[in-house]
Structure formats: structure tokens, C-alpha cells
Amino acid sequence: MPLHPPARRPHGHRRNGSEAQTEATTQDTGRLSCPRRVGAAVCPIQGLGHRAARRPRRGVGTTSASRAPRPGALMPATRNRPRFIHYRVQPPRTHVSFKRPKRSRTHQSHTKVPGWTHEKRMGSSVEEGLRPELSQLEQDADNLGEEEAARLPVTSLNGLLMEGDRHPNPGQGPFFYIGGTNGASIISNYCESKGWQRTQDSRCEDYKLKWCEIKCRDNYCSFREGQQLLFQLPNNKLLTTKIGLLSALREHARTLSKARLMPSTQAKVLKMDEFFPETYRLDIRDERQAFFTLFDETQMWICKPTASNQGKGIFLIRSQEEAAALQAKTQSIEDDPIYRKMPFRAPQARVVQRYVQNPLLLDGKKFDVRSYMLIACAMPYMVFFGHGYARLTLSLYNPHSSDLSGHLTNQFMQKKSPLYMLLKDSTVWSMEHLNRYINDKFRKSKGLPRDWVFTTFTKRMQQIMSHCFLAVKSKLECKLGYFDLIGCDFLIDENFKVWLLEMNSNPALHTNCEVLKEVIPGVVMETLDLALETCQKSLHSQKMLPLQSQRRFVLLYNGETTDLWPRLGSSRPPIRLPYANSNHARSTCEISSSSLTSTRVTIADRPAARKSMSSRTAPICASRKSRLSDSGGVSIEESETSVCSGLPEGSRDAAREPSLGPTEEEREEEQRSTSHRGS
């Protein structure tokens, strides 16, 4: 029976199913004849146009198990052409065919038959895992003859798809994913030493560890609590942005001022102005006007974006002209009608901070110290302090210089110097080197204790870190498996007063200097060791201490003994009382019970934590609140209450401080300050 021309063949044209099948030929003179193809034939459907009608194919189709015959079965057909029905399985790459000239490829099926659902996303783990097997099937099809190719079983491919649904990732796992290049080689070597396999699929949900430089909402939505480790707390911007840290410290200071503490206890609590330079927000009109009112040319100020790092967007304000220019610019932005419609007013998200003009110099160069705060576990909180290194500028310090590389010590700024490659090792000192230098140069002249760096200075950094953590502890989103490593930058002035400059998320983990090659790998590996061990102990309800993986990090805060925290999967949080009749050494940051006038009350509103509390717990909390009110303390219902003293000598654990609920005005301010993306 003569065939219709391909472009004119009617949609309903079919061959009689009882007749022998003949090879389809093409009549298009502009194309060469194509070898016989093997795959799932497409039913001619009205609406697909001439292009669909010009594709005469012969092969084996698939059908749904619930609505169609068994695999490979032919449906009753009429006239000259057999009709095949697709299975309702996932459609990607179900056609194996030939491409001229004799080059195999796979066709993506886009057939839209009634009831067909296209739910598979591009780049899915199933599709990625099937690529090697599909390629092998193509090669096998190339080597087969025409008769053998016509009988190629589709069931093997169908089974392959089903197997891919059961095992989204190839290999045995467990898997880890690293997003970015910061410390990637160190993290990869650590994970591979444990037999883990690296995946390049950022959407992979079957992982043991995910370490990403940039936070992504999807990572936290698909996170499996207690089964996975995820780097960076979701809202760590409360600490790691300039406005977030400033707002947290201010609120904490107001909380402490309202708390009724014993005079001896009040004297031990850190004051914000003792360690944090005077700072104003430019996105709040009253603060902005207050800064421009008090500005004078005798003081230098530094303007910073709230959520940037590497010195980007930073400039100095030293003259009245520079201050006036900044004032005019901020005012013009605020008067812009487009800016008024912006929900978070990002262009104004800056702070101005009083510049420390008398820094301690090392061989005439400005420096600061990078230390680490590790939140190894979030349920319960296990917070550690880790030593880092000193960062120096390449050029001598000149307070009147406009070159930022002489004022900012980070490696990103120093790399801009043409002398960096020759002198880069001189821009980073180990803490041992810094300690020796201060012992030799300043111990006698300044009356410092021996090893001031590892005694007084270290204790002060631990005090400041504990204070900052406690300022945001009740607001951090905590789940078992979250962990974070935060870089803290400290400056020492010529009077040996310690200032906290900023805290940074995703701190630099590059090893381009000899000192960094000694420091950074140890920090990263101990971070991962502690995160793994604390997560496993919390998951199995084991005591945290002692920690076998703790080497150089120092414990600042042990939430196991100070918090009411819920176990994963428990119906109610366990009752955790302070040390009683115990021979354990008390936290060196805790105050004796005789000097405490307030204690912890409840865990009522910790974000992201389980909040169920049984009736057995309520009387205990109520009795604590009653004792607290009777003693003249502050009764707090929405957050845990702790009191922080200064860290005594040999401090190992963190301080506890009270945290009052914010007022309505403070909540609005916090919403503005925390709406920006973390650095």
C-alpha cells in the first residue's frame, strides 16, 4: 500500500496490525534517509503539527501499569500503522536512537498525551545517575543489527528508572557537598579521609555534610535535623553584620540595665562602651543626625556597609567637607520617592564607627587579631573559642594617609600592593610570635604580666565573645546539626585596651602564607570533629563532656548544664537543673549561687526549637519564677535568664546574662537591622 508523503500523512493514518511491518521511509529530498530507530513510538496527536507527523518511528513503547497493558504490549490498531501507548513513568531520556552520521544520542521526550505528567526537574539526581547507564544502552544499540535493535528490551530501561527513584545518588555514600572555594581542599580532604564521597549537585538532599559560603533558603528547608550537618546558622547575621551586632549589643545593654543585680555582680558585667567603639546607624534618621551634630575634625570616623567583607565599601571621614558630603548623599537618597518604597532601605544600610587612632604597632605597622568563635552544636549550645593569627599591614602606619591599605589589615587589601608576593609572609604572625614580641618590647615598659597574649588578652577575647553570644542566644535559630565558625577581629590600642571591631561569617580559610598553613587546617579539622562528636552525643542523649576531639579550642558555653533544651524526638524537654551535689568543676564563668539574684526561667520562645512542655515541667518553672520575683529579680517568661560575670583566671566556660523581651519599638528596629543579607 503506498505511503502518504510525510508532510501530508493524515493523523489518523494507521497500518493494519495483522500485516507485517515494513520499514518507514522518508520522502524529504532535503534529508538523507535515516537508519531504523529504537525507542518509544509517539502516538500521532492532533495539535502537534506537521513536525510530529514527519517522525515515523518504530520501537517499543511503555504504558502505565494501572491504565495500560504490560510493557511492550501492542494496543488494538486499525489500518496500516501500529499504535503504542506510553507508560506513565518519569519521561526523561527514554528514547535511544541514532543521529546522522552514525552518532548516538538520547532524545528528551516532550510527548503530551492525556494524563501524562511532567514532574521531573532538570538536573535531578535521578537523571544524573542514569547518564552512564543510558550511554551504555546507546552503545549497545549501535552495535546491534536492525533485527536485534528492534527487539531491544525496554524493561531494562524501565527498571533503571525505577532504581534511580530509589537511589537518587550513584555510589554508596555518605556524601558531602562544598559550595565555593574557601577552604574547599581542607574540607574535602577531611571528608574523604572518612570515606565520604563528594557530590557536585547543589540540590542533593542525601548528604552528611554541606558547607556553603553563601546561605540558601533551600538548604534549610530540606535539612534533616539530627541526620545532617549544615554549615552556618540561618540567622547568624545577628552577629556577623554591623547593624545586627550593634542592635544585639544595645538591646543586651538595656536588658542588663533593667536587671536588678547585686553590686558585686553588676561590676563584673561587661559594658558595651568598654570593648565596642562608638557607632551610629545611617539608616535611622535620629542616629544619623546625632552623628553629624557631634562630628568634629579632631576625630576620625570610618564608614562601613553593614553586610560586606574584604574592606569593600569602606571609607574614612576626617574633614567637615567629607561629613557634609555624606550627609547630603544620605539625605538625597532618603528623599528619593523610589527609596521610600523600598522595604528595607538597603542603600542606607551603613554604620559610622569611631576610628581607634592610637593602635598598638608592631614594627611601626598596624595590626589586628583574628580569632574564632565556634558554635559546634545548637541543641544544646556548645560554643568554643579558638586562637587564630595576627594580621599586619605592609606599609607603616600613618593616621593622615588616605590609602586604606595602611588602615585595613585584611589580606584582600594587602594583595593590592605590588610588594605583596615578596612580603606576604610578613603580613601574618602566629600568636606565639606576637606573644614573644610583646614580651620583649612592652612587658617591662608597660608593666604587663608575662605571656600577656595568652593570659590577659586571651581572657578578654573570651569575655567579649561570650557577651556577644549571650546577646543573641535566645534569637538564634537552632536545630541539631547546625554549626558555625565565625571570625572575630580584635584591635589592641597603645594602652593595651582590647576592642572588638567586627564579626564575620564564612571567615577566610585560605593558606597562602606559611603561618596560615599551620593554623587554618587545624581550625577547620577540629571544627568538623567537634561538630560531628557533639551532634552524635546530643542525638544519643549522651553527656557532652569530655570531648575526645577537643584539642586547641576552649569551651566558652555549655548549654547542656545551663539551658532547658529539648532532646530530638522527645515529647517534652528534659528538666535540667544547675549543678547539685556534684563534684564537677563549675563553669568558671558562672557566679556563685549566693551572689545570684536571677536564674534561668524557661525556654518558651527559642526560635526553631521544639516548644512543647509537659505539665511536669510547668510547676518547676513556676517555682523558679516565684523565687526570682521574691528575691527582687526580674521575672522573665519569653527567654532564658542568665547572669554574666567577668571571666576569672583560667576561664573555660561562658558567662550567663539576662535577656529581656524587646519592646515594640525595638522589634521594629530589629526587623530593619536583620533584614539584610549576612556578609
From Swiss-Prot:
Mg(2+) 1 binds at D489, E502. It holds the Pfam family TTL. Mg(2+) 2 binds at E502, N504. Residues 18-30 have a biased composition (Polar residues). Its EC number is 6.3.2.-. ATP binds at K304, Q310, G311, Q353, R354, Y355, V356, K366, F367, D368, T409, N410. Residues 1-15, 96-110 have a biased composition (Basic residues). Its cofactor is Mg(2+). Keywords: ATP-binding, Cell projection, Cilium, Cytoplasm, Cytoskeleton, Ligase, Magnesium, Metal-binding, Microtubule, Nucleotide-binding. Coiled coil: none annotated. Gene3D superfamilies: ATP-grasp fold, B domain. GO terms for molecular function: ATP binding; metal ion binding; protein-glycine ligase activity; protein-glycine ligase activity, elongating. The keyword Metal-binding applies. It is found in: Cytoplasm, Cytoskeleton; Cell projection, Cilium; Cytoplasm, Cytoskeleton, Cilium axoneme. Residues 172-543 form the TTL domain. It is an enzyme of class 6 (ligase). This is Protein polyglycylase TTLL10. The gene is Ttll10.
